[in-house]
Regions:
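Conserved inter-motif catalytic segment of the P-loop NTP-binding fold
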Residues: 1-37
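Residue-level preference for long, well-ordered alpha-helices that form the structural scaffold
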Residues: 37-45
C-alpha cells in the first residue's frame, strides 16, 4: 500500500530527490515464510522493485536500497556471503556495492556496474563523516 502511494507523493512533492529503502528483501522474507511461498515472494519482490525503478526513472529521483546477505556454509573457497533475493534483486539493480568492515576500516566493492569494472574503495567512518584512511 505504501509503495502504491509513492507515485502520488512524487507528483505532489517535486522536492523529493532520493528514496531509500533499508532492508529491501527483509519485509518480503518476513511476510512470505518458507519454500512454499517462494514464488509469491519473488513475484511481489519483483513488482516492488519494478515500481521503485519506474518511479526513479519517471520522476527523476535516485533510488537506493540496502539488502541482507546470507552465508553458504558449503562454500569452501572464496567469500561465502551472497545477496538475498536472488537474480530478481541483481537484475533490478544498476549498481551493486558490497560493504564489509575490518577493524575501523570499511571496504566497498563495486561488484556490478554498467560503466566500471569491479573495484574496491577503502574508507573510514568518523564523527565528521566519511574519510580517507
Amino acid at each position: 500500500e505504501e509503495v502504491q502511494n509513492l507515485s502520488a507523493k512524487l507528483v505532489e512533492d517535486e522536492s523529493i530527490k532520493l528514496i531509500i529503502v533499508d532492508g529491501a528483501t527483509g519485509q518480503f522474507r518476513e511476510e512470505y515464510l518458507g519454500r512454499g511461498t517462494l514464488a509469491s515472494r519473488q513475484q511481489n519482490l519483483a513488482k516492488f522493485l519494478g515500481i521503485m525503478k519506474n518511479s526513479a526513472y519517471f520522476f527523476n529521483v535516485a533510488f537506493l536500497m540496502t539488502n541482507q546477505v546470507g552465508t553458504d556454509p558449503a562454500k569452501q573457497f572464496g567469500d561465502p556471503t551472497y545477496a538475498v533475493g536472488g537474480n530478481i534483486v541483481g537484475h533490478a539493480s544498476t549498481y551493486r556495492l558490497y560493504f564489509k568492515k575490518a577493524g575501523k576500516k570499511r571496504y566497498a566493492t563495486a561488484i556490478d556496474s554498467p560503466k566500471q569494472a569491479v573495484f574496491d574503495a577503502e574508507f573510514l567512518l568518523t564523527d565528521k563523516g566519511i574519510d580517507n584512511p
